């Protein structure tokens, strides 16, 4: 089984480019063989296929309403899924995916942690988030949140 770090967001929108920037940072690092790092981009529900057999999943995404500017926050899948207030549409994003996850996976959902950031992240914050994602992906704990 492999752990996965899935960085999501829109690299062309500064309010949503946290995940892609962390992905770029991780791509320049030495990653253990049992950790997959994916640029989830705006993959939406297509990302469900990466949750089927992962030992652990760490999502990295921009968030809103959770923390102060330039702060990193750790959230559980349930905390993010609870932000889904409507059905599926163009802006449903990660909350909808995590809300739907338990209902559509053939196997039990993997442990999921979301590394979130609000606002435009500094280079230092992006680097810290990349290191945190790697640490969370390789630890044995059931859930960091």
What are these regions (language model features)?
Residues 1-145:
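N-terminal catalytic or cofactor-binding beta/alpha core of small enzyme domains
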């Amino acid at each position: 089984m492999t752990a996965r770090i899935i960085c999501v967001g829109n690299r062309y929108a500064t309010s949503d480019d946290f995940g892609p920037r962390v992905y770029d940072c991780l791509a320049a690092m030495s990653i253990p063989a049992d950790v997959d790092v994916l640029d989830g981009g705006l993959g939406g529900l297509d990302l469900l296929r990466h949750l089927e057999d992962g030992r652990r999943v760490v999502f990295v995404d921009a968030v809103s309403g959770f923390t102060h500017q330039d702060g990193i926050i750790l959230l559980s899948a349930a905390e993010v899924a609870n932000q889904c207030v409507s059905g599926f549409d163009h802006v449903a994003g990660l909350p909808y995916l995590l809300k739907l996850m338990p209902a559509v996976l053939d196997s039990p959902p993997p442990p999921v942690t979301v590394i979130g950031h609000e606002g435009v992240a500094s280079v230092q914050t992006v680097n810290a988030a990349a290191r945190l994602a790697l640490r969370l992906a390789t630890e044995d704990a059931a859930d960091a949140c």
